[in-house]
Design a protein with these regions (language model features):
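Active-site-proximal cap/loop segments of hydrolase catalytic domains
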Residues: 1-198
């Protein structure tokens, strides 16, 4: 999947319609797994958003519940949570690769699933990586409440605008959001600077 994704990115760049330094990636469900894998195994993306997350050793086999853990063991052949499954998890677990990930990551999650992201979020945060999490109350895998959808879509646009274009919405209601994001950016001096676009 990653090879196909990167081929599409390369083609878009070759057409002259995308700046290779300003490529973003987003995904929900299996698409979020693709985002995570891409962040671990590629440095092509300058910003990312996931709407579900994550496949990490402890959370998948613990916080997803016993039925899901049993299914993951039986169908996907996931190792037990009590086993050392580092070799299995390393290619796909954000928590085990947090030191390598530089891409700013926004996690927009349903409250029924956010526990699955805590291991990755904590690892990225502890490594001082640019990561932010928002949890929508009363939501499930796919958002159903219009206000939550609107808030997430607006935040997606703002996140990509900030990290890919250096753009900030002057709306005073978003001041705290941009203060947080500037702090994330400023804490990572090795992130490439993006010139502001108006």
């Amino acid at each position: 999947v990653l090879a196909s994704l990167l081929a599409g990115v390369d083609r878009t760049i070759a057409l002259g319609v995308a700046d290779p330094a300003r490529i973003g990636i987003t995904g929900l469900s299996d698409g979020a797994s693709t985002v995570n894998y891409a962040l671990i195994n590629s440095d092509r993306f300058a910003a990312a958003v996931v709407s579900t997350c994550c496949e990490d050793p402890k959370t998948v086999m613990t916080y997803g519940g016993t039925a899901w853990a049993d299914w993951n063991r039986a169908v996907r052949r996931y190792p037990l949570a009590s086993e050392d499954g580092t070799a299995f998890w390393k290619p796909m677990a954000l928590s085990l690769n947090a030191d390598r990930i530089e891409t700013p990551l926004l996690m927009q999650l349903a409250d029924s699933e956010y526990l699955l992201a805590l291991e990755a979020f904590t690892a990225l945060r502890e490594k001082r990586k640019p990561v932010e999490m928002h949890v929508a109350p009363g939501e499930y895998h796919t958002r159903t409440q219009p206000l939550h959808r609107l808030a997430e879509y607006q935040r997606d646009v703002d996140w990509f605008g900030f990290w890919l274009q250096g753009r900030e919405d002057p709306d005073p209601a978003k001041h705290a959001q941009y203060t947080r994001w500037r702090a994330l950016r400023d804490a990572r001096p090795n992130l490439p600077a993006v010139p502001a676009r108006r």
